[in-house]
Swiss-Prot record:
Protein's gene: hisB
Gene3D superfamilies documented for this protein: Imidazole glycerol phosphate dehydratase, domain 1
Taxonomic lineage from the root: Bacteria, Bacillati, Cyanobacteriota, Cyanophyceae, Synechococcales
Biological process, per Gene Ontology: L-histidine biosynthetic process
Pathway: Amino-acid biosynthesis; L-histidine biosynthesis; L-histidine from 5-phospho-alpha-D-ribose 1-diphosphate: step 6/9
Keywords assigned by UniProt, alphabetized: Amino-acid biosynthesis, Cytoplasm, Histidine biosynthesis, Lyase
InterPro entries found in the cross-reference section: IGPD_sf, ImidazoleglycerolP_deHydtase, ImidazoleglycerP_deHydtase_CS, Ribosomal_Su5_D2-typ_SF
Species the sequence originates in: Synechococcus sp. (strain JA-3-3Ab)
A Pfam short name: IGPD
Molecular functions (GO terms): imidazoleglycerol-phosphate dehydratase activity
Protein name, UniProt field: Imidazoleglycerol-phosphate dehydratase
Length: 206
């Protein structure tokens, strides 16, 4: 590895995104090469808990602050946090040079078992297979889980497959999915020492 490549590889991979609309004001700051430290306040307690799993198990330092129209419902804030997080991931990865690109992980949580497979392909896609038989976890509407993942996949420009192999408790299923997502994400964004600063695509661009 040349000195230039070595220097490029060690550049900090950080991002700051602010998304401000008539409905929400969301700020996301992250470091992909962190220790899992986090400060998260979206105003939605269950989403905060899930994002803490993402930070802890993905070793992503993550600060998120969101103020939204929660007096209406959680939909706008949930989606806009996903959008801003996806944009922050894309910003931190830039042209995706030197990463493994693909990631996969199976995560159990008691009776629940969920697999996540992802690809920073530049082609947004979500294949979502969680089977949640209740409408809410606490106050959090379970249909918002899919909306969150769709927003992240779209704006991080990743292909994201989420599959449930087992599970009865909705909280366990969703939390297992976030833990699996965290570990798959960690695998995909790790620097590949053999690839150095090359683009992980035969096309030469992602």
């Amino acid at each position: 590895m040349t000195a230039l490549n070595s220097t490029c590889s060690l550049q900090p991979r950080t991002a700051f995104v602010q998304r401000r609309t008539a409905e929400t004001d969301v700020q996301v700051r992250l470091s992909l090469d962190g220790k899992g430290q986090h400060e998260i306040d979206t105003g939605i307690p269950f989403l905060d808990h899930m994002l803490a799993q993402l930070s802890t198990h993905g070793l992503i330092d993550l600060q998120i602050k969101a103020v939204g129209d929660l007096h209406i419902d959680d939909h706008h804030t949930n989606e806009d946090v996903g959008i801003a997080l996806g944009q922050a991931l894309a910003q931190a990865l830039q042209d995706r040079r030197g990463i493994y690109r693909f990631g996969h992980f199976w995560a159990p949580l008691d009776e629940a078992l969920v697999q996540v497979v992802l690809d920073f392909s530049g082609r947004p896609h979500l294949s979502y297979g969680l089977e949640l038989t209740v409408e809410r976890i606490g106050r959090y509407e379970t249909q918002l889980v899919r909306e969150f993942y769709q927003a992240v996949a779209n704006h991080a420009q990743m292909t994201l497959h989420i599959r449930q192999a087992a599970g009865l408790n909705a909280h366990h299923i969703v939390e297992a999915s976030f833990k699996a997502f965290a570990r798959a994400l960690r695998m995909a964004v790790e620097r590949d020492p053999r690839r150095q600063d090359g683009i992980p695509s035969s096309k030469g661009v992602l």
